[in-house]
């Protein structure tokens, strides 16, 4: 006979006797309660299913401080981040999951309701996957594929509730990480504003440069058109060229006459003084010799004595005329003034005929006119 069965029977008899005695009032209720408490009971959670092995292994690898450089908990502790996906797939996946496919790991996370929190990095979260609360892993259930047949109203309501549960988890994660997201967006906004300001300044500078270039191009085109019109008129109408020559000669003649009058007034007094010195009259050559001997100063303050040259045809006289004719003229007409001074001095000393001009003078006038129309 099995002794265990006998013991059970004895316990049952003792329990029955104690219950009968308690009912008759012979035994105390405390003894009957002690007998009830001594009965064997099953362990708590013995029949409940534990969390899936995938979740347990994922929790272990995330909670391991030695792998924080590759994978670790998020800032709020309600998510985990894979910092180095290549190292995670090459080292940790073969160690814990017997494969090295990171995409397969991500798909398996999706089947358990994990959602990606940050689109810029591998950060996943679930409402039952929290730091320091491993017992909540049993609340994470694997999602079942939707049935192929059209579901009834009750099944559709249950499936909608099941689909809304991960969304609530994502909302919860968003509430925890809202401050970080706002700070990152503010930094991105400030960077974009600085770039926009810089591009706007560069645009304004480029626009100003383009306007200045357009003005220079328009001015050059206008001068080119004027030069083309001038050349066309000069080629078609020879009288137009002669008119320009006469006008320029008249302008130079007027300036030369003014300078000649001023020079004659300045030189008249020394010459008259020499001619009437000591109450005697002398010839032009003798007066020049006396002027050189006495060292009479020139009108412009030059004390250099003049050489002999009846009519003022010497080299010093020519340079003196050239300096006087060049005074007051603009820089672009300096060559014309010098040429006019030389021509005036030659006409006063050697009586050269000013009416004899050759073809070279016409060419010079044409070149000077083109020079005045050319861009500076």
From Swiss-Prot:
GO terms for biological process: cellular response to heat; regulation of transcription by RNA polymerase II. Residues 182-229 form a coiled coil. Residues 185-235 are annotated as: Hydrophobic repeat HR-A/B. Residues 352-362 have a biased composition (Acidic residues). A motif (Nuclear localization signal) lies at residues 265-269. Signal peptide: none annotated. A motif (AHA) lies at residues 318-325. GO terms for molecular function: DNA-binding transcription factor activity; sequence-specific DNA binding. GO terms for cellular component: cytoplasm; nucleus. Belongs to the HSF family. Class A subfamily. The hydrophobic-rich region (HR-A/B) corresponds to the oligomerization domain. AHA motifs are transcriptional activator elements. Homotrimer. This is Heat stress transcription factor A-2a. It comes from Oryza sativa subsp. japonica (Rice). The gene is HSFA2A.
